């Protein structure tokens, strides 16, 4: 799963992240990972299970891509052949051909490539958890969107637990299975993206998600498949995996009230209607 910590600057997001791997010791309370109080685990042992991605890529500028990725496995005393295999595996995973990228220096990479190498380094020792402190903040919008998509695909593939810090509610809504809103060092609400949008806690959380585009944000969380109904509609079908936000854009663009829905085999079997989308986006009672 992915948990997004969101809040304004100074709200305590990064501090909480650092408390998870004990870079900062909590003054009270407990932090548990898989039911175990981390206070009873030696810090070095704890951190071997946790990958950490800092703001920016944080790569060593005078080291090659391969050596950067190999940082933690080398510290752990992995065999050279195991390190080489792991570096190659991660480069392939991030669509960076080892023959082309392994020997490059960070300044020879694009911003998006640097970020991918930074995440690969955090995953090199096969951690069970990945902590990410505003990893995409320095990227331009197009590269940032691609990096977010890559993270979602990576999490689905590896099944790891991710905790990501962001000040951007849009990023939190896109990435988080769970969103934790912070202010003044306190957790104000921990809920699914849909609950955060539909039933925000009064005050800071409500202000964070308020706006005329709140219904569109909610539609962007829901696949067409969840609201499609039996029935016929004319025209080119929309894929069931697309979002309701995509569907309403298509409906308005085509000037129609319904679209056929592709069942995954290219055969329209259901439809999505403006009325169904309108009902889904309505403010909760």
Where are these regions (language model features)?
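Conserved ABC ATPase "signature" region
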Residues: 81-100
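Conserved catalytic motifs of ABC-family nucleotide-binding domains
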Residues: 126
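Conserved ABC ATPase "signature" C-loop
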Residues: 184-185
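Short helical segment in ABC ATPase nucleotide-binding domains corresponding to the A-loop/adjacent helical element
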Residues: 66-74, 84, 88
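ABC ATPase NBD coupling module
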Residues: 38-51, 75, 80-81, 200
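Helix-to-loop junction immediately C-terminal to a conserved catalytic motif
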Residues: 21
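ABC ATPase "signature
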Residues: 190-191, 199, 271
